[in-house]
A protein has these predicted regions:
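Helical hinge/lid and interdomain linker segments adjacent to catalytic or ligand-binding clefts
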Residues: 34-127
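Extracellular ligand-binding/catalytic regions of CAZymes and related secreted enzymes
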Residues: 30-35, 59-62, 66, 209, ...
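A glycine-rich, often tryptophan-bearing local segment used as a flexible ligand/cofactor-contacting loop or short
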Residues: 97-172
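Short, solvent-exposed loop/turn segments at secondary-structure junctions
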Residues: 44-45, 79, 98, 124-126, ...
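A structural signal for well-ordered alpha-helical segments within the folded catalytic domains
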Residues: 54, 58, 101, 105, ...
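Catalytic beta-strand/loop cores that center a nucleophilic Ser/Cys/Thr
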Residues: 152-238
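Bacterial Sec-dependent N-terminal signal peptides
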Residues: 1-32
């Protein structure tokens, strides 16, 4: 009888230990998020930008789970207000920019109060006499520093990118690496002359000629083109990537390339997210 009781007690202890381990593992797996990210997008215009938005809204939740932060996204730009933004540490613009005065004021205050930001590709676009005129001087000239859109390459092609400055964002990034295909932008402002701008990645000369045309101005043969940079006065980064290659010629609108299928490129974005999400102050 004593032997039976001892076995029952041992079995009970094993069950309790198993339950404890299961509970502990569950708690560890669902530990509190380090920070929260909100992505704004429109997703209605260029199919290349729509494709990128869909891809981003699949990739970011995956890396959020792996790195213990939360990711939300919205196409309602009216959510760009102080009350809503108070729930998040980092804001992303996946394709366009805010257009109303209230939205713009809320975003500027978010940044001036130490919030984080990553903008992709078309989010910096501004061109007078277009649907996105340069009518927000703080954003395009002070914050991004780029000014107006100047020109772009065509069609989307890969480039060799070069690290221009050491930074926590470029930590463990090779000096040069090949990017995913992209439509590359040139800007009206010379970012090298802006003391607030820190250029992180630029197109390496080995990339030239860059683009395939058919128009001559869509092929770059020389020049200096920054593609990723920060503004030292804010927790921000602009990334020129964000235009997937699309089968326009075949009229299928099929996605031919994906921005987030590049580990090195992804590492730059993840480094920035983790830095902006956890760093206190500006």
């Amino acid at each position: 009888m004593n032997v039976f009781n001892q076995k029952m007690k041992l079995a009970a202890k094993c069950i309790l230990l198993t339950l404890f381990l299961v509970c502990f593992t569950g708690i560890a797996q669902h530990k509190k998020a380090k920070f929260k990210v909100i992505a704004f997008y429109t997703g209605k215009n260029d199919q290349a930008h729509i494709s990128f938005v869909h891809e981003a809204n699949k990739w970011f939740p995956k890396i959020a789970e792996e790195n213990h932060f939360e990711y939300d996204s919205t196409s309602n730009w009216d959510n760009l207000n102080a009350k809503f933004l108070a729930n998040y540490q980092v804001v992303l613009f996946l394709d366009t920019r805010p257009e109303t005065p209230a939205q713009r004021e809320a975003f500027q205050k978010h940044m001036e109060n130490g919030g984080g930001f990553i903008g992709f590709h078309f989010s910096a676009f501004a061109l007078n006499d277009s649907s996105y005129p340069q009518n927000w001087d703080w954003y395009h000239n002070t914050f991004l520093g780029s000014g107006e859109y100047g020109s772009n390459t065509w069609r989307p092609t890969s480039a060799v990118l070069r690290v221009e400055n050491q930074d926590p964002i470029t930590k463990n990034i090779p000096k040069t690496f090949k990017s995913q295909p992209n439509e590359w932008y040139r800007w009206s402002n010379d970012l090298t002359k802006n003391p607030d701008i820190k250029i992180l990645l630029a197109i390496d000369e080995s990339s030239f000629p860059l683009g395939t045309g058919p128009k001559a101005h869509e092929i770059w043969h020389s020049g200096y083109y920054p593609v990723v940079w920060t503004n030292k006065k804010y927790k921000m980064m602009y990334v020129n990537m964000g235009h997937n290659d699309i089968d326009y010629e075949g009229k299928t609108n099929k996605t031919l390339s994906y921005t987030f299928e590049n580990e090195t490129q992804n590492k730059v974005i993840l480094n920035a997210l983790l830095l902006f999400g956890t760093k206190k102050g500006k």
